[in-house]
Structure formats: structure tokens, C-alpha cells
């Protein structure tokens, strides 16, 4: 088994001499990223990547993930490593403090995420997809969606996914056929199937927030007719905690070379009446 040793000298050079870290930390909101803080974070990230994530890389690729009755079990050690990842605050590193993030420069969080990817790419795909969901909600989410979902996504207690590809629509999003039917109360029922969904189903978080591309009934053809919906794996109770299971299930798994420990799911939306989502 190969050992991962983070190239901290190269990372520091890239951050300081190429990306002008000194200038970035002088910007409003970035002043807490002092040289001592940055160095400490890089050192701890290198330690976590080398001692926790790297040893699981080969284990995960040999074991893979297991699917049974729509549920997915991740490889040995992944769930525990993710719990440690969340408890240590790594997921919140570069996120907005308004929603529980640490507000550190994106340059730093990018350097840290590079260590996750280099030491265990299959593991790193989960927080990477969650980060994408966070960014999408920050830009396009409603105030209610931000308040409900962002704190748990930022902390890493919940994970996020991106649902674009369909059996008849790969990179051609104009061909997306998943549909969203309005219920009348501000929600929609989502119907369709999505494939190649990274971490579309797993056991590492209490909930999964799916961002799903679908068409409303009167939507025009092509990409202009596509809308993005928030579809949680579990509907939320009045206290904001996961409750009843939503109508989205993993019906099988794909297998990708080199990342067998990353569950690549085929997700069915609406086979039992419609998956509830919000625009």
C-alpha cells in the first residue's frame, strides 16, 4: 500500500508565491487567515489525509460499496472517517459563517481539498458534491431553502448531490426528460430516473440533499426549459430533522475504475407517487 505524504512545501509555494496569499488575507473577511493559522490548518489536513484517508484508499477500492434493497453500505472505515471529517470541521472550512462556516479563504479550502483528493479520491467525492450543492443554494436558493438546508450541508451532517444525467440524456442536458408536476402548495412531485449520480445513496450522513434537473409541464424544449429542484432523501419534520422517506431510491449502482468506494447510483424518482421537491 502506498503512503500519502502531502507536498506541503509545494502547496505553500503555490499559495504564497503564485496565488498571492498575502494579498488575499488582507481582503475584508479574510483577516483571520494569518500565516500561523494557515500553516496549522495545512499541517493538520496533511495529517488527516495521511493517517486517516490514505490507509482507506486501497481498502475501499478492493471492497467497493454494497447495494441491497435500495440501501448502500460504504467500505470499511469510510463512515467512521467521515464522522471524524465532520467533527474536525473540515467541511465548513471555506463556507459562509452565516450558515456555520469558518469563512476562511477559498484558496485555503482548495489546497486542503487537494489533499483529500490525492490521498483518497473516492472519499473526497462526497464533500466535493456537497460543496457544489452549497454553492448552488447560496447563489440560487430561496431564503427558506438556505435556512433549512445550508447549516447541515455546511457542517457536513448532510451530504449533497448533483442529478443531471439520464439514460437518454448524458452531457446533452437539452434532452432531459425528468418532469416536475406542481402540487399547488409550492412543492412539486418529481418523476424520472437519473444515472451516474456520485454518492447518490450511502450511509455516511443522516440525509442527502439531491439537486435535480427536471421540466415543469409547460416548459419549452431545450435547456431553457430545465429547472433545478431541491429533493431531500428524507422529508423534514417541523423541527428540521429528517422524517419520512421521500420517493427517491437507489435501484442499482454503476462501477467506475479507480473509485470503487464511491457509490455511483442509479436513482429512481417518483415510482411511488412522486418525490417531493421545491424549486
Task: Kindly label every feature range from the protein language model.
Residues 1-124, 148:
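Amphipathic, small/basic residue-rich leader segments at the start of a protein or domain
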Residues 11, 15-22, 48-56, 144, ...:
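Long, well-ordered alpha-helical segments
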Residues 84, 92-94, 161-163, 177-182, ...:
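Structured core elements
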Residues 92, 96-97, 119-134, 156-166, ...:
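Core alpha/beta catalytic barrel or barrel-like domain that forms the active/cofactor pocket
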Residues 129-130, 141-182:
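Internal maturation/activation junctions in enzymes
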Residues 168-171, 201-203, 220, 256-262:
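Short Gly/Pro-enriched turn/cap motifs at secondary-structure boundaries
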Residues 187, 191-241:
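A short core secondary-structure module
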Residues 196-198, 235-251, 256, 263-279:
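A glycine-rich, basic-preceded beta-loop-alpha segment at the flavin cofactor/substrate interface
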Amino acid at each position: 500500500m502506498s503512503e500519502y505524504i502531502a507536498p506541503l512545501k509545494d502547496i505553500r509555494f503555490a499559495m504564497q508565491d503564485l496565488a498571492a496569499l498575502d494579498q488575499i488575507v488582507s481582503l475584508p473577511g479574510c483577516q483571520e487567515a494569518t500565516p500561523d493559522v494557515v500553516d496549522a490548518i495545512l499541517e493538520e489536513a496533511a495529517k488527516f489525509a495521511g493517517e486517516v484517508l490514505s490507509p482507506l484508499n486501497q481498502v475501499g477500492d478492493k471492497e467497493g460499496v454494497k447495494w441491497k434493497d435500495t440501501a448502500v453500505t460504504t467500505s470499511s472505515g469510510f463512515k467512521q472517517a467521515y464522522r471524524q471529517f465532520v467533527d474536525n470541521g473540515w467541511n465548513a472550512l471555506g463556507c459562509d459563517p452565516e450558515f456555520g462556516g469558518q469563512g476562511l479563504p477559498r484558496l485555503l479550502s482548495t489546497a486542503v481539498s487537494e489533499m483529500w483528493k490525492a490521498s483518497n479520491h473516492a472519499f473526497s467525492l462526497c464533500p466535493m458534491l456537497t460543496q457544489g450543492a452549497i454553492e448552488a443554494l447560496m447563489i440560487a436558493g430561496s431564503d427558506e431553502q438556505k435556512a433549512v438546508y445550508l447549516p447541515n450541508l455546511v457542517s457536513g451532517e448532510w451530504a449533497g448531490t448533483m442529478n443531471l444525467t439520464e439514460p437518454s440524456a448524458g452531457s446533452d442536458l437539452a434532452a432531459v426528460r425528468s418532469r416536475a408536476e406542481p402540487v399547488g402548495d409550492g412543492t412539486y412531485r418529481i418523476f424520472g430516473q437519473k444515472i451516474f449520480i456520485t454518492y447518490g445513496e450511502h450511509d455516511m450522513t443522516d440525509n442527502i440533499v439531491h439537486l435535480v434537473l427536471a421540466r415543469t409541464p409547460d416548459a419549452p424544449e431545450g435547456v431553457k426549459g430545465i429547472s433545478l429542484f431541491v429533493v431531500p432523501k428524507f422529508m423534514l419534520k417541523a423541527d428540521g430533522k429528517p422524517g419520512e422517506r421521500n420517493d427517491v431510491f437507489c435501484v442499482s449502482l454503476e462501477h467506475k475504475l479507480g473509485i470503487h468506494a464511491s457509490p455511483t447510483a442509479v436513482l429512481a424518482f417518483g415510482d411511488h407517487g412522486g418525490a417531493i421537491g421545491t424549486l
